[in-house]
């Protein structure tokens, strides 16, 4: 399928989030000819740096990690086939807040402290320009509780409202039909833990889902995108984020700075937050993010 009428917007908090949770989906839709737009809310300045030779870039040293990660993200987008990328408000407008409770939560420019209306107005401008039928971000809990993920959810929900409001701002109003949050079913994680346990890789193994810090009950997952054919693109994108991610030389496995092994999924899962639900296909779920939209499925 090649359909330039399909337009989808992904709103992510930091560089690498797009590749970890939605990389295969982005690569699939880009390869099919859809307009895939990625908006990143921060530069990821507070990330923990894996390569020892680059640790001088850390926020408590030279504080130049953010600018370095711009290059990583550019390389990752190229691997995914994504040509439309923007930083919300421009590169560096908002700063990575760090994990919940960290002193960096109090930085005056951190995204956690951003005025939601201001950030939403800027995102609404992008929505009106791109005119996506589908928007993807996180749930209200921020997937695993990161303050920037929570804020990205709040900003995206409000921006979608503003973009559709004829009384708001300049430009032609646009109503994005569907809003999704990233999600991983607990049963999928359980199978992944078993696979990680029985496979060869250099990472630490976990024995329970709770050790991963994310995963949702299966009945909350409405949609699965089978993008296994695009897993190589996702792995290439993960490798591009070398300050944050290590990818195994064998198998679809990776780890962040905590060295806990995770599976890179080719099938990616979502929860429909708002909009028409398409017909159930796989495991009672939609089989695509454009499902239920006439002429776009």
Swiss-Prot record:
Cofactor: Zn(2+)
Primary enzyme class: hydrolase
Annotated positions binding Zn(2+): 14, 17, 149
Assigned EC number: 3.5.1.103
Enzymatic reactions: 1D-myo-inositol 2-acetamido-2-deoxy-alpha-D-glucopyranoside + H2O = 1D-myo-inositol 2-amino-2-deoxy-alpha-D-glucopyranoside + acetate
Entry's Gene Ontology molecular function annotations: N-acetylglucosaminylinositol deacetylase activity; zinc ion binding
Record carries keyword Repressor: no
Record's keyword terms, sorted: Hydrolase, Metal-binding, Zinc
GO aspect biological process, one term: mycothiol biosynthetic process
Superkingdom assignment: Bacteria
Cofactor binding mode and count: Binds 1 zinc ion per subunit.
Residue runs in coiled coils: none
Keyword Lyase found: no
Record-linked InterPro entries: GlcNAc_PI_deacetylase-related (IPR003737), LmbE-like_dom_sf (IPR024078), Mycothiol_biosynthesis_MshB (IPR017810)
Record family assignment: Belongs to the MshB deacetylase family.
Its biological purpose: Catalyzes the deacetylation of 1D-myo-inositol 2-acetamido-2-deoxy-alpha-D-glucopyranoside (GlcNAc-Ins) in the mycothiol biosynthesis pathway.
Record-given protein name: 1D-myo-inositol 2-acetamido-2-deoxy-alpha-D-glucopyranoside deacetylase
Gene that specifies this protein: mshB
